[in-house]
Amino acid sequence: MGDVLSTHLDDARRQHIAEKTGKILTEFLQFYEDQYGVALFNSMRHEIEGTGLPQAQLLWRKVPLDERIVFSGNLFQHQEDSKKWRNRFSLVPHNYGLVLYENKAAYERQVPPRAVINSAGYKILTSVDQYLELIGNSLPGTTAKSGSAPILKCPTQFPLILWHPYARHYYFCMMTEAEQDKWQAVLQDCIRHCNNGIPEDSKVEGPAFTDAIRMYRQSKELYGTWEMLCGNEVQILSNLVMEELGPELKAELGPRLKGKPQERQRQWIQISDAVYHMVYEQAKARFEEVLSKVQQVQPAMQAVIRTDMDQIITSKEHLASKIRAFILPKAEVCVRNHVQPYIPSILEALMVPTSQGFTEVRDVFFKEVTDMNLNVINEGGIDKLGEYMEKLSRLAYHPLKMQSCYEKMESLRLDGLQQRFDVSSTSVFKQRAQIHMREQMDNAVYTFETLLHQELGKGPTKEELCKSIQRVLERVLKKYDYDSSSVRKRFFREALLQISIPFLLKKLAPTCKSELPRFQELIFEDFARFILVENTYEEVVLQTVMKDILQAVKEAAVQRKHNLYRDSMVMHNSDPNLHLLAEGAPIDWGEEYSNSGGGGSPSPSTPESATLSEKRRRAKQVVSVVQDEEVGLPFEASPESPPPASPDGVTEIRGLLAQGLRPESPPPAGPLLNGAPAGESPQPKAAPEASSPPASPLQHLLPGKAVDLGPPKPSDQETGEQVSSPSSHPALHTTTEDSAGVQTEF
């Protein structure tokens, strides 16, 4: 590899790449500085005027469920240096960075991991043929001849390949189709989370960055959705540079690569990965510099906005009226002829899979709570409630149980519309809807937790507890139905705008864009940082199509075809005290109701200091969300689970459950039991805390560089394969069985 890079990436070419990258970054960062003032003004105006959106009925977690392991297990990884397949112990922590260890024993001994992979921008491929086709298309002229050895050979029929257009690729395989499906769901969850790298609560920096990306690409005549808007700001910036730099390098270096087609493909992957990380480091330094600069002047900008808010609004409205008078006739004709006829078909294509997915979320939540209720009746009441509720609290982050919800969106098709509206891929809409599903599931679970915790304060008996769970479930489902409708309608409106606005801007650009500079004189110089002609122009274009979009969504709600509430149905203060309950400390179900005999407080004989110490110890525990219920790989030793016990609970209450908790739609086909000990292996206790050296500052290292550091604490700022600095976490067990120390080689 070193010879390839030294040959094709010598000092002169590296200097050229750095200069080209710097030029692109300088141009983009000017857009970012311009958009920062606009985003700051919009944020402060939003705080004063409000959103106008319906009030959510469900609660949301203010303290996230950190310190958990989403998944752990074994899989084979292809080693590029030795060209061999090795068995690796892998786990996914709460930040969704895939961590690969030599084996489980290495993990328990806190040996540094082999790799930490941030999967933003990656795609999962489930066949070698798919991969070879993509590789052949990425570097023309390198398609291998029939019968020749491909770039990759998989020893089983169940591969999983992580493919990225610029960074290195990762090759895994499993022994069974069931394992492949399981890991595909887990890795897809990692990609979904890592792609959503810009924080949702970023009200200024986030919108400023995404608007700057859009404005920069439009300045290059690139409209429509962009698949590589994935990851955090630095990763997205790196993708932006590579979008322009990659084809240039490919044209220069492609003809110079030597060897068979497979070898040239391998060389190009190595070169592209090296360039990508050069760009990443340069983009990171430049972006942090500019971000620090705009944040330093933010207080002064806020002072101007607070003082002159009314004048800024008046000036912007005056500018908008002038632009509207100029473009409205052209925009209305364009909307009427090219957009309006297609809105119903686009909306229908979006509504069907999205509504099916949200219905599945409701069904999964219903079944999990119902199963928990039956388990409470049959197996110990409040004594087991803490264990069951801890599992339920993590339901939204269980990739396998949520998979039936997510996969509904995979049927989304915009056939015939993608080319017309320049929609390169539907993946951006699929992932956005899936993120909404996870959020609504977590909101429903958290609201259920909060209401049930209030009921438990009354000291109910087992029968009363069952009825309380039923009543709380019914309340939460009503709130979920309302919030689900609101979230879906907002998603439909945003998706329709995301499809139609770039199309309209592209259509209007030849006749309108060149005339925009003359409107600049209408903006007072003092307000020029908060009002931009381009942004105001886009808002006017948006308004011309917005009324048609709102009308289409309103008509869909009136039809009640997809269980959408009408806009006139508003639930005001249906639970006025509910939001007050959410202001308290997070509920620790394991602490309050684990073997407490129904009591929610520590034993009187337990010293307070010991209780606090126990809480601190528990806070460090890494709890696996996913408990492996299937047979392990052939090289694993899995203990057999006892056969499920036959429920013998209270007949009357079971009848109540059957009558009162029947969902409107059929439950999922697969078993989704929560808290049934017969179906899940018991979770082992955490190993005692081991002494470890003081943690060093977290280092963001480049992919592919092995560094002997401590156990991983993956960062969302990473890109590709990385290894993190030592952490003070103890070695903790997860629930997936594996054979520690086994090295299997094909």
Swiss-Prot record:
Changing S681 to D/E: Promotes melanoma cell invasion. Residues 720-746 have a biased composition (Polar residues). This is Protein Niban 2. One of its GO terms (biological process) is negative regulation of DNA-templated transcription. Belongs to the Niban family. One of its GO terms (cellular component) is plasma membrane. Phosphorylated at Ser-641, Ser-646, Ser-692 and Ser-696 by the BRAF/MKK/ERK signaling cascade. In melanoma cells, the C-terminal phosphorylation may prevent targeting to the plasma membrane. As apoptosis proceeds, degraded via an proteasome-independent pathway, probably by caspases. The lineage of its organism: Eukaryota, Metazoa, Chordata, Craniata, Vertebrata. It is a lipid-anchor. Gene3D superfamilies: Pleckstrin-homology domain (PH domain)/Phosphotyrosine-binding domain (PTB) (2.30.29.30). The modification Phosphoserine is found at S568, S574, S601, S603, S609, S624, S638, S641, S646, S665, S681, S692, S696.
